[in-house]
Amino acid sequence: MSKKITIVDTTLRDGMSSVSHQFTPQNVADIARGLDKAGVPTIEVAHGIGLGASSIQYGFAAATDPDYVRAAVDAVENADIAALYVPGIATLAELQQAIDAGIKTVRVAVHCTEADCGQQPVEWAKEHGLTVMTFLMMSHKLDPQPLAEQAAKLDSYGADVVYVVDSAGAMVPRHAGERVAALRQAITADIGFHAHNNLGVGIANALTAAENGATFIDGSLRGLGASAGNAQTEVLAAAFERAGWDTGVDLFPLIDTAEHVVAPLMKEPQIVDETALVLGYAGVYSTFFHPTKRAAKKFGVPARDILMELGRRGVIGGQEDMIIDVASELAGRTYETPAPAGV
């Protein structure tokens, strides 16, 4: 009897980062419809950084989160629509708007050392009838046992699934397996794994995570996602089937959606370029990818030098302002406060 694995697709959330958050509601509907026909049970939809993130800081989306959610909900027959909630970016009011638009699942994402930041949204979401998946972002930054202790907190708040999240694409299979195995000993909730492909091992990490107890695996069509992108949904489906797992997903409709719906919308192929590779090697959060490239060009400093220094400083998501500081320092420049007018 085949072992069961649940594939969650994040093309319409993490994949938004690959198109500067410019999928239209019609694009969302077309992609969601294809995923639903292929049997994908949960489809994540929102701005690339999550609910409430459309801003000058993270980039303005082509539509509102409720518009995206409604487009997906109206397009599917069976799949649940999910949204990402990051405390400090999203608000409960915005989560309520997403509920009103039709989400059935919320994914609450916290830094791997800050599980307590997820207590309020997790408990609120459970009270409002949602399935709750939780993310321990930048999971490579904690050893397995401390990570499991953080996971236990999320489990105690009522999370249905706790994810090991390789936000930087910094893990190799051993790292993924050890962390999932530690969680399996510490919590009763299901375990998920979210890969990024910066070191080229996203699929291998996902397979190893499953072998060690993960039952939910994230992917995105054509690998769309921040920096090097995510584990590729259609490849995940094929690889898991070859490895003897039951995904419940129909491979060829999935491939068709990737090939004929998603690929024409891509600005460029999703590849592991120099910046993406060094970002994973340095263990830097994936959202630093584009801002680092811009800073490198502005200050005439190699992007890899900026990323290696950011990695040495241990920056995390939300500290993107450090990119300019580091680039300026490396270029031998400093910013001065402009003198008041007329002085």
Curated annotation (Swiss-Prot):
Please give a single GO biological process term from the UniProt record: L-leucine biosynthetic process
GO molecular function (one): 2-isopropylmalate synthase activity
Name the CDD domains on file: DRE_TIM_HOA (cd07943)
Keywords on this record? Aromatic hydrocarbons catabolism, Lyase, Manganese, Metal-binding
Q: Does the keyword Zinc apply?
A: no
Record-listed Mn(2+) binding positions: 14, 194, 196
Per the UniProt entry, the disulfide pairs are none
Residues holding substrate = 13-14, 167, 194, 285
- Pyruvate carboxyltransferase domain location, by residue? 5-255
Q: What is its EC number?
A: 4.1.3.39
Swiss-Prot/TrEMBL site (Transition state stabilizer) positions: 13
Which Pfam families does this entry report, sorted A to Z? DmpG_comm, HMGL-like
- What domain of life is recorded for the organism? Bacteria
Q: Which reaction does it catalyse?
A: (S)-4-hydroxy-2-oxopentanoate = acetaldehyde + pyruvate
By sequence similarity, the record places it as follows:
Belongs to the 4-hydroxy-2-oxovalerate aldolase family.
**Which NCBIfam families does UniProt cross-reference here?**
4OH_2_O_val_ald, PRK08195.1
Q: What is this protein called?
A: 4-hydroxy-2-oxovalerate aldolase 2
